[in-house]
Amino acid sequence: CIRDRSTDGSIEVIKEYAGKVDYWVSEPDKGIYHAMNKGVLQAHGEYLNFMNSGDEFYNNGVLQEVAPSLDSDIVVGKIVHGTEVWGFHKEDITLMDLIRGTVLHQASFFRKELFDENRYDESYKIVSDWKFYIQTLTFNNATFRNIRSIVCRFVPGGVSETDAGTRDMERKRVYKELFPDRMMKDYIRLEKVESPLLELIPELNKTAGLHQMAYKLVCALLWVHGKIKRVRVK
């Protein structure tokens, strides 16, 4: 357990259960990723999970439930965010998935050997875990498994949610650091594109006439929608 000398009462809780904690320290750190890297150095297990202060495992049986699924480099479950269950819903993960979002480290189990090649980049305030996913899954070809288990209860309102400006700025910095601009142009263009129509494109491409017809139909619908909005404003 790595603490930064905060005064939220967590130290008293740790001391109460000190007999069940293998290692803990309370000292100043340089941010969340510095603290997480300190945890990596002290960890001796086969898999690592990083649970932030305030977050908690979903129930007492989570680790036993997840253990049989730990056969990949990164195993990811679900989280409870407020009253909703959040999680990655595809069987596998792609670079586009990471560009459009991220995977919460609180719901992730990492094979410890992954940190032999990369640690969390402490020069970032918010997106170093996102950068780590890109490095390990894209460049190191780490294996990935998505499971249905709910791993943790996540406390909303963290810095990644409340400081969107810094988050977006840091993500752009990661792009420049890891990818040539020419490689990222198409991905950046599609980053904000979220539409069920994308799933129809492969079928539409099989018939040029149908493709053009669908394009004209969508343009017409957008024109009508724009007219309706202007009428409502008036």
Regions of interest found by a model, annotated:
Residues L48:
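Short aromatic/hydrophobic "clamp" motif used to bind/position activated sugar donors
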Residues H81-V174, L178:
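Conserved nucleotide-sugar donor-binding catalytic segment
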Residues S10, M36, N59-E65, S128, ...:
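Acidic donor-diphosphate engagement hotspot in glycosyltransferases and nucleotidyltransferases
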Residues E56, N60-F88:
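Conserved donor NDP-sugar-binding/catalytic core segment of glycosyltransferases
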Residues T7, I11-K15, G165-M169:
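Short, surface-exposed alpha-helical segments at coil->helix boundaries
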Residues V13, S26-A43:
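Glycine-rich, basic loop-to-helix element that forms the pyrophosphate-binding segment
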